[in-house]
Amino acid sequence: MQRYEITGMSCAACASHVEKAVSAVPGVAGVAVSLLTNSMQVDYTPDADPDTTARRICNAVEAAGYGASLATAESENAELEDTETPKLKKRLIASLCFLVPLMYVSMGHMIGLPLPSFMEGHGSGAMVFALVQLALTLPVCWINRAFFISGWKGIKSRAPGMDALVSMGAGAALLYGLYAIVMIGIGLKNDDMELIMQYRHDLYFESAATILTLITVGKTLEAYSKGKTTDALKSLMKLAPQTACVLRDSEQVMLPVSEVQVGDLFLVRPGESIPVDGTVTEGISSVNEAALTGESMPVDKFPGSPVSAATINQNGALTCRAERVGQDTTLSQVIRLVRDAAATKAPLAKTADKVSGIFVPAVTCIALLTFVIWLLLGQTFTYALARGISVLVISCPCALGLATPVAIMVGSGVGAKNGILFKTAASLETTGYTDAVLLDKTGTITTGEPSVVKIVGTRNVPAKFLLSMAAGLELRSEHPLARAILKEAEKDKLSYATVADFEAVPGKGLQGKVAGKVIAGGNADFIRETCELTSDLERAGEEMSRDGVTPLYFSLAGKPAGVIGVSDVVKQTSAEAISQMKALGLQVVLLTGDNAATAKHIGAMVGLDEDHVIAGVLPAGKEAEVRRLQAAGRVAMVGDGINDAPALTRAETGIAIGAGADVALDAADVVLVRSDLADVPAAVRLSRAVVRNIHQNLFWAFFYNAVCIPLAAGVFTGIGITLNPMIASAAMSLSSVCVVTNALRLNTFNPRSAAHDAPPKHKAPARELPAETVCETRSCPVKNEIKTEEVTMKKTIHIEGMMCGHCEATVKKALEALDGVQSAEVSHEKGTAIVALTADVADADLKAAVEAKDYTVTGIDA
């Protein structure tokens, strides 16, 4: 994917024309243009030469009347800076310097303001009156010549935009004023006072100047508001320090952050921002990570802990080793994800895009038709012209074009500030449509790190001694449960027993010798081979199992030594998070590979009944569970991305939780930086708020044009309602401002607040979970029977435009959504999708499904 900077765009029609021009370039597989950031993202076909294609793209954009250049790191950062508003402010101030005296001259006499004597009268004074207005109007036209230049380029390339409407409206008023001067001259020559009087009051110069100035007012407010939409990213970028204290040959050297290399040791003092991603090598401190995760509580850091750029060291000095620098830091990835999401198109934007593509030609035709109809109805040329100009300048494609992207940009920024990263505009929109949430257990509901929760010793082996002995035995084991015992011993500052003759017995446990005595640890059956367990230990182990805790039994010198309970601890926020999901109208299902007893216990702890727990599922079976849950509606799969990538890809929305520094997980649509399940309902809330905001914006944009165009055309003249061109231009200017301002309200939205949680008002009809999915264990033969369909046929689809794993996931989802398609194996490297069919699916349907996602089908083989 290549990013380009685009110049010269002023409205949604411009963006549509650029997309159309670039889409026709050979070697282009897909293109998305962002009016908000004046940028374009292009996917190349696998056989495209990057340099040649880039040159062709720039030429195509320039031929369409705009400018294009390859984006660089500097230009990407610069695009977040608001350089447009200061320029527009200067234009506005300069325009007002001429407009104010122009309005005094042209309209002051209407409210009793005096005019100089040489402008009064019906003789030469009328000509002076007209020429002074012309002299004050021409500078305004020159100051705002960008409208005329851009508008003419658009007309010339048969791709008119908003600037074409403005330039035609203002230009028509200016030309009519020049015509009026000529007619006044003829009247003076022929001493025709009636002709002079007629055109003296119909000069329209003030309309031309006012249209341009008011549009500039709107553009200035719009630019300012658009600049505010990237405040979240700007605040993140400002947090990153420009310099770093790097240790070179034991000396502290201050270097620009851009010169820090992987492997460098750098020092961070209390109160300083961490310059790059790294790992702590020396020191203990707490770090404020709110900038990246939204977490208000500082996080303790000690040797071995990861640290991220733009987070703030609070109390102790830290020495760290640089791991990720430059564009590879977590901060840079977050900025890139938010920027890329803003550059993509949400499904809701498609309707607006289609309208924008034909909007300007349609409005131009309406304006001409309005002009002709009023002439045919017997109105004066001046009246008909005023109605036509009003239609031109009141029409606003900008409001349509901005309705979706401004909300997406602000919503993405709010998500980034809270550690919720949406990879595309589509994922930001569709997350809120979720019907059911499938939760992986390990690392999602639980911490993913087993901990010792109970130690039961014997009369001869106290708990502390048992833990020390067990730690010595587990020291050489690689099992996850061994790490839990070692961690507990380290927390209690116990020394490990020295173990000799260590041996691991697969599937059973461990054994060795301590001071010449045989020590063994493992499951109950293994320990029974070395000794007879006491009833107390048997009972303690059974209680642990019932509570979802794994019991590890130990023996010493042929006698029972005790039992240690190890469990994957449920996160403190999991139960509340699941409660919030239910309040949002979501059906929540727990998915785990544990046995039924443990699964029931974990489910009960977080508020899930047995009917919403699926146990005994191996990692490879998660995708099948997602597929079956999709019979109930739209599914979101939540996992840590370690062993559930296929399931994340299969779900309508894949949510990776606890990504930390790895925010670019390919399989996920949404990435949660924190390991907090509460961010899942937060993501749903934010998505619904953004969609609600987009609906409001689109309603306003369509409603505004639907009402104002007939109003400007004079449809309501019969009831005394008309609009002159000046009022029409003011209304047009404010329409875009209203849309952007409404989107900016999202900046105040708190996605973690559950105060107003409720099921969505507009969503697909709720469906109960299919009976075969709700089961307590995989051993249940009836409820867990997976319905399979006989595959009758396979087809290979050849596809251009797929570039990565995310492209594969998009095509896979599109194909498997078709009736009769059982599965699809997609490879972006081979450029193919192999579909298994249970019915005869037409090639045209397969092609349409793929091309609806902006990829190109070159052939289908049976």
What is each PLM-predicted segment?
Residues 16, 270, 344, 434, ...:
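Conserved ATP-binding TGD loop and adjacent catalytic N/P-domain core of P-type ATPases
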Residues 452, 456-586, 596, 608-626:
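P-type ATPase nucleotide-binding
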Residues 111-127, 156, 175, 414, ...:
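Membrane-embedded alpha-helical bundles of multi-pass transporters
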Residues 2, 76, 184, 188, ...:
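Juxtamembrane coupling segments of multi-pass membrane pumps/enzymes
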Residues 136-147, 154-157, 171, 194, ...:
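Hydrophobic alpha-helical transmembrane segments
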Residues 1-130, 226, 251-252, 332, ...:
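Flexible metal-binding regulatory segments at protein termini and peripheral loops
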Residues 26-47, 55, 59, 203, ...:
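Conserved cytosolic catalytic loops of P-type ATPases
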Residues 29, 87-243, 354, 723-725:
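Transmembrane helix-loop-helix hairpins at the membrane interface
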